[in-house]
Amino acid sequence: MLKVRFAPSPTGPLHIGGARSALFNYLLARKEDGVFIVRSEDTDLERSSRESEHNIMEALRWLNIQWDEGIEVGGDNGPYRQTERLALYQEYTDRLLASGDAYYCYCSEEELEQERQDLMAKGETPRYLGKCRHLSAAERQTYEAAGRKPVVRFRVPEGRQILINDRVRGEVVFDSDGIGDYVIVKSDGIPTYNFAVVIDDTTMNITHVIRGEEHLSNTPRQVLIYQALGLPTPEFAHISLILNTEGKKMSKRDGDTAVIDYQAKGYLPEAVVNFIALMGWSPPGEEEFFTLEEMTQAFSLERVSKSPAVFDLNKLNYMNAHYIKQADPERLTDLAVPYLREMGAIPQGTLSEEERAWVTHYVQAIINHLSYMAQVKDFVHYVQGGEAPTPEGEALEILQGEQVPAVLDLFVEKLKSLEAIRVDTVKPLFKQITKETKLGGKQVFMPIRIALTGQMHGPELYDIVPLLGLENVLSRLAGTKALLAGSR
């Protein structure tokens, strides 16, 4: 049975790159009726926290990436935190020490740094040259009597070609002579990544390791441990780096990189999942919008590119805007409420039926202007009380047209004649005014829009008027007429 895993370090939030790795593992597991495990690589004791671990799990759940075994769900292959598996690592450490594939190293940091500097001065690759490879029991005893705490190093075989048939990158060959003996257990007894990950993948029966390209250089070290222990090696698939639109590695300077940042801004999870799936995976055909189920059916490692993926925020915004337009209005209302409350546009506490209806109408009125839901805050000034923003530039010039006072007066007259201010009652007024004044549509619509919002573009006028309400509309129109009177 196919088994895959996602193994984040709980030292911070789930980032876009990690979310993509989790997604690709999830998709392959679902496609092949396999098992998806999520575990925690928490051996960085200073930086790891249960809070970060939980936040990562919540981010995965928000993306609807569900796992079969692991953190917070349990399973038959636990425990799923590395700090709870130390006794298991010790068993395998003892096996490597007994077979001579590992040894204790007592070199100090100063000695290692000097060796590193000497190799660099010769133009050679920095690596450990094996000073402690053949220590006698007496030499070990002397070091320990001096208070030196050893690490455990893996004895790298010399002159070996390490071949990796990567499912994404093809055949990759490494030379063991360029690696040097590396640490597998630190002096405090905590295993290093390259050792612990092998034991975890083995004991959890992982068949496929799908992870970021940055781990490719670790793979020969892990393969050597598999071979020394006589363990089967999983299939590897190293997915490409994610670059910004300038072709550089993503960083904080490129904006938000954590999944929670996009959740906080009101991106829809299905849009984020769709977007990150297309960073490195090319589905068959021309379609670019997929449900999670559709992605599962179409996914294969053969269609994952080894070329760098590009994080294009404009593409994410485009995709999210599409999903917003497709979303249920009630869901969008729920998403909009916290942002509107935050700015005081609606009251705290449970909304009345009328207040909730106002939010629903407001969101639908501006839906074509939304790339993410936090932008509902950007249009409130159009539709709530108070003066409209003062028009400037071309907008002010349009208001100074000679037909404008008559258009505004006629609009006021017709509004006052309505029994109720609703979209269906307001919408016909503009055609009526156009017909009665014999003016072009733009000569009617634009002055009214600018008078009410101060802007030349925005939501439909027949939406703005009911949202503002008659009192606010009349107030803003009166303010505009006063502005014009003062400038004439």
Swiss-Prot record:
Highest taxon of the lineage: Bacteria
Source organism of this protein record: Desulfitobacterium hafniense (strain Y51)
Keyword Isomerase tagged: no
Family stated for the protein in its record: Belongs to the class-I aminoacyl-tRNA synthetase family. Glutamate--tRNA ligase type 1 subfamily.
UniProt cross-references to Pfam families, sorted A to Z: Anticodon_2, tRNA-synt_1c
PANTHER family in alphabetical order: GLUTAMATE--TRNA LIGASE, GLUTAMATE--TRNA LIGASE, MITOCHONDRIAL-RELATED
GO molecular function: ATP binding; glutamate-tRNA ligase activity; tRNA binding; zinc ion binding
'KMSKS' region, short sequence motif: residues: 249-253
GO BP, sorted A to Z: glutamyl-tRNA aminoacylation
Keyword set, alphabetical order: Aminoacyl-tRNA synthetase, ATP-binding, Cytoplasm, Ligase, Metal-binding, Nucleotide-binding, Protein biosynthesis, Zinc
Chain sites annotated for binding Zn(2+): C105, C107, C132, H134
Catalyzed reactions: tRNA(Glu) + L-glutamate + ATP = L-glutamyl-tRNA(Glu) + AMP + diphosphate
EC number, as in UniProt: 6.1.1.17
InterPro entries recorded: aa-tRNA-synth_I_cd-bd (IPR045462), aa-tRNA-synth_I_codon-bd_sub2 (IPR020751), aa-tRNA-synth_I_CS (IPR001412), aa_tRNA-synth_I_cd-bd_sf (IPR008925), Glu-tRNA-ligase_bac/mito (IPR004527), Glu/Gln-tRNA-synth (IPR000924), Glu/Gln-tRNA-synth_Ib_cat-dom (IPR020058), GluQ/Sye (IPR049940)
Binding site for ATP: K252
Protein name (database record): Glutamate--tRNA ligase
Cellular component annotations (GO), alphabetically ordered: cytosol
Role of this protein: Catalyzes the attachment of glutamate to tRNA(Glu) in a two-step reaction: glutamate is first activated by ATP to form Glu-AMP and then transferred to the acceptor end of tRNA(Glu).
Cofactor descriptive note: Binds 1 zinc ion per subunit.
Intervals of motif 'HIGH' region: 8-18
Assembly with partners or alone: Monomer.
Location in or out of the cell: Cytoplasm
Claim: Zinc-finger is one of the keywords in the record: no
UniProt cofactor(s): Zn(2+)
